[in-house]
Each structure stands twice: as C-alpha cells, then as structure tokens.
UniProtKB/Swiss-Prot annotation:
Family: Belongs to the T7virus minor capsid protein family.
Organism: Escherichia phage T7
HAMAP family associated with the record: CAPSID_PROTEIN_T7 (MF_04119)
Feature: compositional bias, Polar residues: 362-372
Protein name, entry field: Minor capsid protein
Single GO cellular component term: viral capsid
C-alpha cells in the first residue's frame, strides 16, 4: 500500500528557510515536569566531630598545651627541691584564614522569564560550598598532623605523635572488597591501641574514609552480619561503630580546603598532599585509605559564622546572594590523630605455573619489599611447587 502523502504535521517547524526534515515535534508545548533536578545535597561531616571555638575579635586563637610530670618517693631527709620536675608549657595557635565567600547574581529579566524558583536552591548551594570547604580543610589538617617532620611531631616531648598504619598488602593487591575491608578493620584495631597508649579518651573517636573503603568494611562484616548487628545495618548499608571509632563516609576525603579561585586549587589554604614521599609526606591522596582522630585533634576558630546576605544591584538590575564566613582551621594534638594507608612495598607477582627449584625459590629479589607474612607465603608456595614436581617425577618413572 502506498504511503500517505500530504496531511498536516503541525508539530514540524515549517517556517521559511527551515529544512523539511526538521524535528516533527518542535512546535508542540513542553510541559513543566513539576520538579527541578537540583544537585544532590552535600552534607558537612566534621562540624560536630572536632573542636570549634568562637572569638569576637582578633586574628587568631591560642590553645595552651601543658605537659606531664611524674611522682617519686621521698625518703627521710631528702628535699623535694631536688626531685621536682617542671611541667612544660607550649601553645598551638590557629589563625583566621580570611573571609571565604560564594555568591550568585540573578538578573531581573531572567527571573521574570523563568517559570520555576531558583533562589532557594542557589542559596542551598552557596551554603554547601562553604561547608565543603570547611570539611576539606579539617580533613587536610588531620593528614597534616601525620606529615609533620620529626623535630616538630610532638607538642611536648613524651605526649605522643600521630600514628600512620600501613596495610599488610599494597594497593594493587587489595582489589577485592572483602580483603580490603579486613585490612581496614585490622588497621583500626592497631589504631585503637595506638590512641589508647597516648591516653586519648575512648569516647569521640572518628574514622573518616571514602565510599569505597566504607563499602569494603561492610563487605567484610556482612558474612557474619548476625554477629555484628550492633555494628552494621545491612538493610541500610550503614556502619555504626568499629573498634571504638565512629565510621564516617566522606566522598570529599582528599579535596582539601578552598583557594583564591572558584575553579581548581589556586591559592588553596589547606592542601591535602598529592603524593607520598615528597618531603615528609607519609599520608597523601595516592595512598590514604582513611583518617582517624579524637575530636580534640583538630580545631576550628570562628570569627564570623556562616551567614547569608542579599543585596540589590540596581546598576545590573539584579539581586545578589552572598554566603560568607571567617574561620581558621589547624591541628592541635598530633597524638590524637592518625591515618590508615596502603603499604608502600612492591607487590609480589603471581606465582608461576612452572615448578621452581628449591635454590631458585629461595632467591629473593632485591627489588621486592616483603613483610614477614609475605616471605612465609612465598616459602610455602615454593615448598608446594617442589613437592608437586617431585610427585610428578616419581609418577613418570613408574
């Protein structure tokens, strides 16, 4: 049957100069869907989990640090003056970083033409951008406490240093989520002991990690979920507490603080190191799994809290919305902070299917950095290969 020719196609844009093969639905009405697809909300995770102080004026805040003393027995006739030990004092100072701002300009003509509201969402996004900057700064300061050079890594000698815990395998070997989760749990066991050895209070301990590491912990605990009902909620995919640490999922773990430009890291105030091994850097973007701390490890000083300001820009016929705050962030207690990082050693290669001789198996490459556990595993593999070769030879002779 022949195709119909002619007939009205009202949706097609048939104006002068328009190609006939244009959109056949172009002229039909686009109905507002009733919902604006705004960006997902970003939530600050550090605000309630570290020390925050407010000042009414000035450029910085002082945090005095006191050391410890020791008791000693006093025998008859001895003088206390001969045994006295001075309690050392020092201080930590957090300086206000400056006035951090985010703003948007809404032109009257565009606002009049628009058929949906944008002001509330713009306001939310401005506030979120400042919250993310504060989060990034606090997390970068935790990493900073782990990277301080040895002559400055304690507030007062004897109070303790930051703890950096390596996994027993390197990053390339921990692609399995369950294996990674077990490594993180084992590291948190060591972290718990390290903080307790520094007399850090058991309460208010937090472990910040990215979504991959958070999911890995869940995967490691899931097979025994019934036994860990107090720790995880498999239905919601959430973790409450592991080894005394509140586990917090942070997508922006290594973002760092704000800079002098809206795009990129130009003039960034609190930088999260990019690469391990540069100077004293032990914790960086390329090896960090998570950061742990007590709430007193890092501090924030507020000169002006988060505020919103609306201004009329008559010369542009527009309204301006400004979000701003004046804060400073800094590390306070190295002994109450630490990080879990991937092992920096070279990964063992996959065992060859060709049986090696005992002499060959006993040779360890000077290029490989092996832990005792890896050395034992390699020896067991070599012994197994030797036995299989001997068995195959005996079978062939028969």
């Amino acid at each position: 049957m022949a195709s119909m020719t002619g007939g009205q196609q009202m949706g097609t844009n048939q104006g002068k100069g328009v190609v006939a093969a244009g959109d056949k639905l172009a002229l039909f009405l686009k109905v507002f869907g009733g919902e604006v697809l705004t960006a997902f909300a970003r939530t600050s995770v550090t605000t309630s989990r570290h020390m925050v102080r407010s000042i009414s004026s000035g450029k910085s805040a002082q945090f005095p640090v006191l050391g410890r003393t020791q008791a000693a027995y006093l025998a008859p006739g001895e003088n206390l003056d001969d045994k006295r030990k001075d309690i050392k004092h020092t201080e930590k100072v957090i300086t206000i970083d400056g006035l951090l701002t985010a703003d948007v300009l809404i032109y009257d003509i565009e606002d009049a033409m628009n058929h949906y509201d944008v002001r509330s969402e713009y306001t939310s996004q401005l506030g979120e951008s400042l919250a993310m900057a504060a989060d990034g700064a606090v997390l970068a300061e935790i990493a900073g406490l782990c990277n301080v050079e040895s002559k400055y890594n304690e507030n007062i000698e004897g109070l303790g240093t930051a703890t950096v815990i390596e996994t027993t395998q390197n990053k390339a070997a921990l692609t399995d989520q369950v294996a990674l989760g077990k490594e993180i749990i084992a590291a948190l066991t060591k972290a718990r002991a390290a903080l307790t050895k520094n007399y850090v209070p058991a309460a208010d301990r937090v472990f910040y990690c990215d979504p991959d590491s958070y999911s890995a912990i869940l995967a490691a605990l899931m097979p025994n979920a019934a036994n860990y009902a107090a720790l995880i909620d498999p239905e919601k995919g959430s973790i409450r507490n592991v080894m005394g640490f509140e586990v917090v999922e942070v997508p922006h773990l290594t973002a760092g603080g704000a800079g002098t430009a809206r795009e990129g890291t130009t003039g960034q105030k609190h930088v999260f190191p990019a690469n391990k091994g540069e100077g004293n850097v032990k914790v960086a973007k390329d090896n960090v799994i998570g950061l742990f701390m007590h709430r007193s490890a890092v501090g924030t000083v507020k000169l002006r809290d988060l505020a919103l300001e609306r201004a009329r820009r008559a010369n542009f016929q527009a309204d301006q919305i400004i979000a701003k705050y004046a804060m400073g962030h800094g590390g306070l207690r190295p002994e109450a902070a630490g990080a879990v990082v991937f092992q920096s050693g070279v990964m063992l290669g996959v065992a060859s299917t060709v049986a090696a001789s005992p002499e060959e198996a006993s040779v360890t490459s000077t290029e490989e950095t092996l832990t005792p556990a890896q050395e034992a595993a390699r020896t067991r593999a070599a012994n197994k290969a030797r036995k299989e070769a001997e068995l195959a030879a005996a079978t062939a002779e028969q």
